[in-house]
Every structure is written in C-alpha cells, then in structure tokens.
C-alpha cells in the first residue's frame, strides 16, 4: 500500500524494540527535509505545527493518539519485543543513562530489586499494551505543567506511567488488539530481517541489502536472576498476550506478502 499524500507515516516506537535502527532505515525512503528528527515528546509538542505538517515521516516514543499534536491522523506502524527481554534491556538502559528520570532510584538496584520495587512498575509493567491501548491526553497534561516540572522530566514520567485503571486492566489489551488491526505494518525485534522484508513489501520499497544496527549495547549481565524473570513475566502478562497475538498476524502477513 503506497502512502497517501495526505497522511504522514508515524512509527510508534516502544523503547528497546530496535526503534532507532528501524527509523534510520525508514528515513532512507523519504527526502531528508521530510523526516522529523528523533526527539523527546516535549520537543515534538513545542515544534510549530506548520513545521510538523511538512514531515512525511515521524517517529519516537510518542504513544498512541498523536493526532492533536500532528494535526492529522497518521499511518501507524510499530515494533514489538519479547516482554522479558525488553524489560531487562530497558533496565540496563536506565543504569547506563544518568539523565533518565529514574536513574537516581534504579542505579543501585539489582535486576531483582528493580522488579520488586513497586515504584518501578510505571516504567515497564505491560508497557507495550499501554503504549497502544491507552488514550493519553498528551497536550492537556503538557499545558497544565509549569516550566520547572517540564525541565525535570516530570512530563515524561507522567506519560510513561499513565495507567488510569492500574497496570493490569485487560481492557488495555483488547483496545490494543483492536487498534493493531488498522496498522498496515508491525514487526518484531527478534525477527528484524523478516520484519524489514515485510515492511518493504507492504509499502512497495526496495529491501535494503545492508543496514547499520543503532543503539546496540552488549548484554552487561553474566546471568539473570530466575526470580526477577518470574516477576517480569507476572508484571507483563498482557504484553505477552499482545506479543503472541501480533506474532500470529505477523506470520500470516509474512507468508502472504513475502513468501508467496
């Protein structure tokens, strides 16, 4: 399906799902001046609407329902990752990055301690489902905060931790599944090459022969605590259900569009 002239492509990038790598590949299919820079949600909001509407490709950790920011309904695509692997990778990311709003609390925690600290649940509990299945009033929350709160990353913290009915409400999952029906493409970090093939077949692009993996860091853990893994599984049960649901759809699309 070629992209229509009136709708930008929006890559809803869930953290630690190979988003940076895919976005750089996506950017090669558009003129440079039509590709939005990867930036924070706050900076996207503060970008003049006239400039935003010149972009044909937009991507970042901006969640679902970005129409009020973009001024138009975009074409949504996304990537998924095994929930346990994603949480462990995100934990490692927070450890490495002192500018992350949770670093001050997490940097001295083991993975097990991280998963047992209830304050950390907003960071990762069923986060993939919450990225797709919730309606955040992004602009409304932004406008209510003063400059001091914005400068301290409080806005990002509120958006990431948004869960009006707690972290385990199955209605989030059902909503995410329904919304996914309208995504012409979604892929998986574990099957990145196959995802790239399906992406290109979906939009009529040439499949790149080579690409550079971005933001790839070696696994810093010699071993993973079994109890921590068990905790993560319980805290991401809805994510696992969405992952398995999406994988069935992905395999069917791959068979139809790539293999046949």
Language-model features, listed with the residues they occupy:
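A cross-family signal for N-terminal binding/gating loops and helix N-caps
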Residues: 2-44, 50-70, 79
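A residue-level signal for conserved active-site and pocket-lining positions in enzyme catalytic cores
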Residues: 18, 82, 187, 199, ...
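A generic structural motif
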Residues: 36-42, 87, 209-219
């Amino acid at each position: 399906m070629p992209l229509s002239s009136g709708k930008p492509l929006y890559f809803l990038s869930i953290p630690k799902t190979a988003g940076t790598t895919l976005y750089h590949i996506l950017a090669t299919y558009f003129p440079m001046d039509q590709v939005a820079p990867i930036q924070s949600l706050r900076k996207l909001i503060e970008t003049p609407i006239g400039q935003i509407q010149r972009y044909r490709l937009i991507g970042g950790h901006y969640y679902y329902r970005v129409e009020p920011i973009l001024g138009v309904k975009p074409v949504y695509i996304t990537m998924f990752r095994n929930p346990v692997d994603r949480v462990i990778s995100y934990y490692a990311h927070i450890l490495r990055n002192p500018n992350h709003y949770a670093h001050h609390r997490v940097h001295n925690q083991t993975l097990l301690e991280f998963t047992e600290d209830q304050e950390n649940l907003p960071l990762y509990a069923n986060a993939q489902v919450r990225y797709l299945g919730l309606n955040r009033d992004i602009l409304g929350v932004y406008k209510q905060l003063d400059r001091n709160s914005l400068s301290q990353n409080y806005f990002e913290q509120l958006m990431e931790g948004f869960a009006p009915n707690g972290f385990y409400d199955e209605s989030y999952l059902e909503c995410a599944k329904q919304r996914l029906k309208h995504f012409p493409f979604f892929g998986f970090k574990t099957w990145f090459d196959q995802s790239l093939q399906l992406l290109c077949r979906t939009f009529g692009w040439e499949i790149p022969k080579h690409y550079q993996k971005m933001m790839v860091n070696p696994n810093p853990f010699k071993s993973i605590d079994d109890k921590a893994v068990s905790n993560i599984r319980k805290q991401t049960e809805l994510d696992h259900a969405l992952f398995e649901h999406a994988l069935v759809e992905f395999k069917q699309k791959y068979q139809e569009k790539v293999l046949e």
